[in-house]
Amino acid sequence: SLDRGTTESIDNSIPFFAELGKMNIETTLQGFYTNAKISGSENQKVYEKYLKIKSNLNDENLDLLEKEIKNNVTKNAEITEEINNKRDKLTIRKYLYTANFALVNPKYEVSPYIALTEIPDANLKLLDTISKTLDPKVAKSKYGKRLKEWIKERRTNEEN
């Protein structure tokens, strides 16, 4: 991430997916995070596609949270159960979307990164499938290796 220095603002850094070659980050001091435009990284483009859908899923979760807070006043058991069911389905959608995204983008280093950061506790078969479908170059990358190590560590811990 790119850090603008010491400030009281919550948008002190710009997260981006770096790769070899020339990259360009343009922004303003007033909107350091929100106005950032990043170019020169194919992985960043792919990551931004993922983040758009993740943002939509987060919005759905916030809507459920709002309903839950409102329901805390009336304490309607049916509404509570409905909210919990919707949240469970949303969690499943998030996991499936994330896994599918990683599986259909095996040529990008961002795929194992997303698997590691978004669904590290997913079913081992799913993580293993993601790892095995990675392009050989990606499998040898930092996050490809970390994903493989994470799967091995989880297998060891689950066997004990």
Q: Which residues make up each language-model segment?
A:
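An accessory alpha-helical subdomain
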Residues: 65-101, 112, 118
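A non-transmembrane, solvent-exposed segment enriched in polar/low-complexity residues
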Residues: 1-82
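A generic structural micro-environment signature
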Residues: 22-24, 31, 89, 125, ...
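Charged, long alpha-helical assembly modules
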Residues: 96-160
